[in-house]
Design a protein with these regions (language model features):
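FMN-binding flavodoxin-like domain, especially the glycine-rich phosphate-binding loop
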Residues: 4-132
Length: 132
């Protein structure tokens, strides 16, 4: 996930056939087992993908990591602006995702679970998913 969307997804789906079967994998810092986070990710995908393609999509959400010290100036600035905006929100307005961002700001965090790739591999290996 990048700035609330799946980077490049909107342009990618424009090139697909109307009945294309696709796998969408999101990777972000948000807890992928938190229903509110899942709902927010799905809303973002719904804005980027036409319904006819979404109906044939298999969607997975994975957690990634971030090392703030390795971000370029543009992204460090974006993160600083976002952090300064959300840290002053009232507690009842802070989502789990926002709280996690505040807690991990300016740190190196790694939530990567390579075992989570197994479910994606399983779907890819199911020939029926991509049979014409």
């Amino acid at each position: 996930m990048y700035a609330g969307g799946v980077k490049g997804l909107k342009n990618t789906v424009k090139a697909l056939k109307k009945d294309a079967k696709i796998i969408i994998v999101t990777v972000g810092l948000a807890d992928v087992y938190d229903q509110e986070n899942i709902d927010n990710i799905r809303k973002s995908i719904n804005k980027q993908v036409p319904q006819n393609i979404l109906n044939n999509a298999t969607i997975f959400h994975l957690r990634g990591g971030i090392d703030h010290k390795k971000l370029n100036l543009k992204h460090r600035t974006m993160m600083a602006l976002l952090y300064n905006k959300v840290k002053h929100l009232p507690e009842n307005k802070k989502t789990a995702e926002i709280k996690a961002m505040i807690e991990t700001y300016n740190q190196k965090v790694d939530f990567i679970d390579y075992d989570a790739l197994n479910q994606i591999i399983k779907v890819i290996n199911q020939k029926s998913l991509f049979a014409q």
